[in-house]
């Protein structure tokens, strides 16, 4: 009964999101919304052009040709009209060949554009006759992601059809439509486009959100089926899913695939808006790319996330999504990101010419708040100490849901960068092991063991990977001791309904916040329950992160990580992981990780306070032959020649394990960040109160509930030391608390808010008591 009620609630939520989609848009008067097969969608207006621009935008085309900021784009397109030289044509034409657009398709697109401006019938007719035969006869040999090339070819045909519409003869319209349907049936998503997934996968890229949508709009008057099918699936599945996660201001496909996946979301935005439907997306879409802004390292690289490869010779840019989002939302921060590398790929240059806002200014991120939170369904936090070369960057993750595909099983993971990658995501997407479904990818790189998270090792646990796509298919992946593989055999959800009804929930955000100044916070806090990320081998797993901006040139930052891990069997061994590039040094309860190569000079020193020294085993694993070690097997993945010069895929990890078998264990680790030449760090003291455990470090006092449960009763502890301390007390019941020091009222009423359950105040040494 509870399960049925839960599924009913999911159905209502999804249907409500479909219903409210129209509420985001400002539809033009000649665009009406209709219900088609149970899906509400905007209908293309009875006018041409309506694809990528309307009649009111046509007069501006000549101005854009003379715009100084678009002159190079126009010159590039003129040059792109030249055919490929035979010697330059590869033997196997994959999508990259077609995306490096040249020749016929560019010529006819520019003819169609010229026709819009001049209305010269000869030009319009030439565009039509130049492309129609090729549309009918073109063949595409199977090759990597060839649907992208087929779809781009369809886009060219759609441009000619829509922009030269009044020059088309009735029989030519029929020929175009038949050719489009023929090509659509070659696409990976099929025609009707019902194959693959709408949240992740190739059907969440060009095929539906640009290619079929474009053709459907162009030919709607003569053949409404294609638009109804493509737009029907888009509004029922693609849009609903995105409007569900967009309010979090983040994306789920990692820092490489963010580029292509989000670009196509934005193509759908522009296509429908220019058609006249307005913005159908949740306005949170504007802020998705801010994640990349916050993860931008001082060396120009991006903090790793999801399926990525490394090369310091090639900084990571988000040219097209930054252009599309920046110009649409008039966002100067995004335009600044675009201008880092304004070299748009050939197949998108026409869209830069049509859509780029050349009057938009640019703005550095220097005045943005230093911490950024991404809420449900993610639960991610980024904390920085600044925007310059001395900046520390820390990432903290809960992962309320696992979207799979290019997202990893990394609930509870963290990363730290300072003058080089210190606490890293290990492994890499491609290399000597292969690609998406390589042994390295599915047994190490995508798995919890490759991240700074927690393992609970049940030697009998199995991990079904029978649904995981790609070559090198296996029914099972290695037992890494980590988080379960959601879905049936690790297959991603098709749509939002399947995601919410399935087993893709992996965590819950328990608390988050930063302050006391939101612009330059002293602390940044995130806590999550990630029990659901694991199988029944665990009863409870909670992790708290607290990042401290120490505002000290010598030791600029620290991060405290507190964990509660309860296994279903006390014999299941627990592991606290810390990954690095260079070999760590272990002395007692201290772990030192340095960057000494490739121009890097940062250092991380971790002090393990829990488990107690007598119950703590700290070891390192790594070096050639054990760099990607998974309980007896090394999943080697050497970089391709000329890539990963700094070995950012890593080679070492530290494991902290309790010596004594127990169902319940706690970890408390204090990480200080400094230059690798810094000799003196802050003393780290553990605080033990009657209901709390915590850390005294520099001028900071931080506490957590000893049991990781909410503290709702009076408690206390003592502080010894000189000067004034800044206190951050977490895990408190929201509401008013009174603070006593040495038996006297220090603060008669301090409020712990509901979102973070934390108190922040200042005080000196003494005995503190906290009352409700």
Swiss-Prot record:
Job description of the protein: Cleaves both heparin and heparan sulfate glycosaminoglycans through a beta-elimination mechanism. Cleaves heparin at alpha-D-GlcNp2S6S(1->4) alpha-L-IdoAp2S and heparan sulfate at alpha-D-GlcNp2Ac(or 2S)6OH(1->4)beta-D-GlcAp.
Protein name: Heparin and heparin-sulfate lyase
Primary location: periplasm
Catalytic activity: Elimination of sulfate, appears to act on linkages between N-acetyl-D-glucosamine and uronate. Product is an unsaturated sugar; Eliminative cleavage of polysaccharides containing (1->4)-linked D-glucuronate or L-iduronate residues and (1->4)-alpha-linked 2-sulfoamino-2-deoxy-6-sulfo-D-glucose residues to give oligosaccharides with terminal 4-deoxy-alpha-D-gluc-4-enuronosyl groups at their non-reducing ends
Binding site for Zn(2+): 408, 425, 451
One annotated Gene Ontology cellular component of this protein: periplasmic space
GO molecular function: heparin binding; heparin lyase activity; heparin-sulfate lyase activity; metal ion binding
Signal peptide: 1-25
InterPro entries from the UniProt entry: Chondroitin_lyas, Hepar_II_III_C, HepB, HepII_C, HepII_N
Superkingdom to which the source organism belongs: Bacteria
Gene (UniProt): hepB
Compartments, record wording: Periplasm
Taxonomic lineage: Bacteria, Pseudomonadati, Bacteroidota, Sphingobacteriia, Sphingobacteriales
Subunit structure: Homodimer.
